[in-house]
UniProtKB/Swiss-Prot annotation:
An annotated GO BP: melanin biosynthetic process
Record function comment: This is a copper-containing oxidase that functions in the formation of pigments such as melanins and other polyphenolic compounds.
Native species: Neurospora crassa (strain ATCC 24698 / 74-OR23-1A / CBS 708.71 / DSM 1257 / FGSC 987)
EC number(s) on file: 1.14.18.1
Cofactor(s) needed for function: Cu(2+)
Positions annotated to bind Cu cation A: H67, H97, H106
Coiled coil: none
InterPro entries: Di-copper_centre_dom_sf, Monophenol_mOase_fun, Tyrosinase/Hemocyanin, Tyrosinase_C, Tyrosinase_Cu-bd
Amino-acid positions noted as binding Cu cation B in the UniProt annotation, renumbered to this chain: H278, H282, H307
N-acetylserine modification, residue list: S2
Family classification: Belongs to the tyrosinase family.
Propeptide part(s) removed at maturation, as residue ranges: 409-685
Name the UniProt record assigns to this protein: Tyrosinase
Length: 685
């Protein structure tokens, strides 16, 4: 294959250290609070990077365009195909979604982005005045700069939003290169095209209308509505944290962990994947904007923070499972550089990314360790430990600190945050009666969610009672549905001592639900044709009643979680997507249920996590809906190959509170049979 330019992807040049240490990619909020000079350089460097001539090979525009539109070869890989004509060949695009190469392909892609951003940061640092030591300070800070990540699954710092203000604010304060503090257009909020179509037809008519990237754009004006994101992330945070914890601590096979393609042999415990969770964040943060469409998502600055976090989660998982890597599989579709049916393996070239020699393309085997590109993460500083065992124990400790050790500990931490943007008031310390904070009360009034508040008071009051005596079954009194007006989560309000985490692995008031440290864990599995609707859509899962207006679904109290399907139209220029569509590619995802069931238990609506109690409860209360890219409801039974099922497995919690999953799953068609697209006894999982 001929190429015009062999652009070597090196990542950031990193001098070797005596102990193998490399600089860290840091969480965005950590970078902003604890490394202010690097954060300032990040903003200024990104601003300049985004301002580069769009014709420049390593410009922001060109690098983002590798991921989808404008569907042109990058660095001449290949150089002899006219991609302006969608029908000129069967190929299209480099990206490898729903394939075994999904997470490995994105690593050199991120290294290219980081390489270009780093160069911009270094140039900015040199522009500061020498006087007062300002230049020296910023040059020193720039040396170890690495691209940050946004950890969307961890609890936000107290008193802050689930979606950081640094990402949602249209302007932001910086110390500019003249040494003066000023307000600039926030380069983390949007990328402004200059112009939107450097070459005629680079973007479709639908995307050409936007001069800048947008999130949840207003249907009439096209204005970005970033304020929608924080309450949506907050409302489904418990499900998201449980999903990440499940993936990192339960999944042991790389193929199952990494990507979302479904086949008839998929185990009920393997419907989830890192790609599935990745899709959810694209959907939750983009709505009907750029992030929710893979063809244009890389132009949104959030894309890079999101994907660095995906890369981080892979690094964590890979170091916990060093002996598990990809199994060779046939390519499910054709791309610019791969024929359908060709074997994809750890030796498959990750085109268009040339290695450091510029003689060969990177392969998955070569990029397995992030240190290859000169970076690590706070959790993967392996050089600090004397043995693999000690290192892995430290990783697990970090995972449990960020995402919870087990579902019971997670529940105590998440119970007051699962509802939209802290509509649930939290109880105060040692008082015998719960009180509502002014902020939470205001949010409740704004959302009209007084019954939600009453229910959460009951959650705290019931917990100790249920530890002492059996629950008397009561009529379902699910909280009335509501929408969120407030966004603040994690306020510094003490929970009652009865529901705080105890030194043991399971909180005292919940131990009766896991005799001998064992309990039944529940999940909802969803599968559907990826491109069956010709657009992105989401399957939203509820446990209880909800408002029939789809505009409210993201904020519903009884919304448990979602599976997001990032589909494309049959007319897309993306060759692989056309192939996927023609072949009826099916993808899958998982929504954890156990945390929501625990809330119903302490709320007096469910007796235990045992099948004899959960089956009728789910049969009566489990519901799901489909919403399209623009938020409109879509008829469930018209979604090709949509199937929803419920499964469970036994989990044992060890003395340190870590869950050990049996991986033997039972499927319950009696829960979903007869419901629209519900799994029945004769259906294939």
């Amino acid at each position: 294959m001929s190429t015009d330019i062999k652009f070597a992807i090196t990542g950031v040049p990193t001098p070797p250290s005596s102990n193998g240490a490399v600089p860290l990619r840091r969480e965005l909020r950590d970078l902003q609070q604890n490394y202010p000079e690097q954060f300032n350089l990040y903003l200024l460097g990104l601003r300049d990077f985004q301002g580069l001539d769009e014709a420049k090979l390593d410009s922001y525009y060109q690098v983002a365009g590798i991921h989808g539109m404008p569907f042109k070869p990058w660095a001449g890989v290949p150089s002899d195909t006219d991609w302006s004509q969608p029908g000129s060949s069967g190929f299209g695009g480099y990206c490898t979604h729903s394939s075994i190469l999904f997470i490995t392909w994105h690593r050199p892609y991120l290294a290219l982005y980081e390489q270009a951003l780093y160069a911009s940061v270094q140039a900015v640092a040199q522009k500061f005045p020498v006087e007062g030591g300002l230049r020296a300070k910023y040059v020193a800070a720039a040396k170890d700069f690495r691209a940050p990540y946004f950890d969307w699954a961890s609890q936000p710092p107290k008193g802050t939003l689930a979606f950081p203000e640094s990402l949602s604010s249209r302007t932001i304060q910086v110390v500019d290169v003249d040494g003066k503090t000023k307000s600039i257009n926030n380069p983390l909020h949007r990328f402004t095209f200059h112009p939107v179509n450097p070459s005629p037809g680079d973007f479709s008519a639908a995307w050409s209308r936007y001069p800048s990237t947008v999130r949840y754009p207003n249907r009439l004006t096209g204005a970005s509505r970033d304020e929608r994101i924080a309450p949506i992330l907050a409302n489904e945070l418990a499900s998201l944290r449980n999903n990440v914890s499940l993936l990192l601590l339960s999944y042991k096979d790389f193929d199952a962990f990494s990507y979302n393609r479904w086949d008839p042999n998929t185990n009920p415990g393997d419907f989830g994947s890192l790609e599935d969770v990745h899709n959810e964040i694209h959907d939750r943060t983009g709505g009907n904007g750029h992030m929710s469409s893979l063809e244009v998502s890389a132009f949104d600055p959030l894309f890079w923070l999101h994907h660095v976090n995906v890369d981080r989660l892979w690094s964590i998982w890979q170091d916990l499972n060093p002996n598990s890597f990809m199994t060779p599989r046939p390519a499910p579709y054709s791309t610019f550089v791969a024929q359908e049916g060709e074997s994809q393996s750890k030796s498959t070239p990750l085109e268009p990314f040339w290695d450091k020699s510029a003689a060969n393309f990177w392969t998955s085997e070569q990029v397995k360790d992030s240190i290859t590109f000169g970076y690590a993460y706070p959790e993967t500083q392996k050089w600090k430990y004397s043995s693999v065992k000690e290192y892995q124990a430290a990783i697990r400790k970090s995972v449990t600190a960020l995402y919870g050790s087990n579902v019971f500990a997670n529940f105590v931490e998440n119970v007051a945050d699962r509802t939209p943007a802290l509509k649930k008031p939290q109880a105060t310390g040692e008082e015998s009666k719960s009180t509502v904070s002014a902020a939470a009360a205001h949010a409740v009034e704004l959302s009209g969610a007084k019954k939600v508040a009453e229910k959460v008071h009951n959650v705290f009051q019931h917990a100790e009672e249920k530890a002492q005596k059996p629950v008397v079954p009561v009529k379902d009194t699910k909280a009335e549905s509501s929408t969120a007006a407030g966004m603040m989560i994690g306020l510094s309000i003490k929970r009652p001592s009865k529901l705080t985490a105890s030194p043991g692995p399971i909180p005292e008031s919940l131990k009766y639900l896991a005799p001998d440290g064992k309990y039944t864990d529940w999940i909802v599995n969803v599968r559907a044709q990826k491109h069956g609707l010709g657009q992105s859509f989401r399957v939203i899962v509820f446990l209880g009643e909800f408002n029939p207006d789809p505009e409210t679904w993201d904020d519903e109290f009884n919304c448990v979680g979602r599976v997001s399907v990032l589909g494309r139209s049959a007319e897309t220029q993306c060759g692989k997507c056309r192939k996927d569509n023609a072949n009826g590619l099916i993808v899958s995802g998982t929504v954890p249920l156990t945390s929501a069931l625990l809330q119903d238990i302490v709320g007096g609506e469910l007796q235990s996590l045992k099948p004899e109690d959960v089956i009728p409860h789910l049969r009566a209360n489990l519901k799901w809906k489909v919403a399209l890219f623009n938020g409109d409801e879509y008829n469930l039974e018209e979604v090709p190959d949509l199937k929803v099922s419920v499964a469970s497995t036994e989990v044992t919690i060890d003395e340190e509170g870590l869950p050990h999953y049996s991986r033997q799953y039972t499927v319950y068609p009696e829960i979903t049979e007869g419901k629209p697209c519900g799994h029945g006894p004769e259906d294939h999982i």
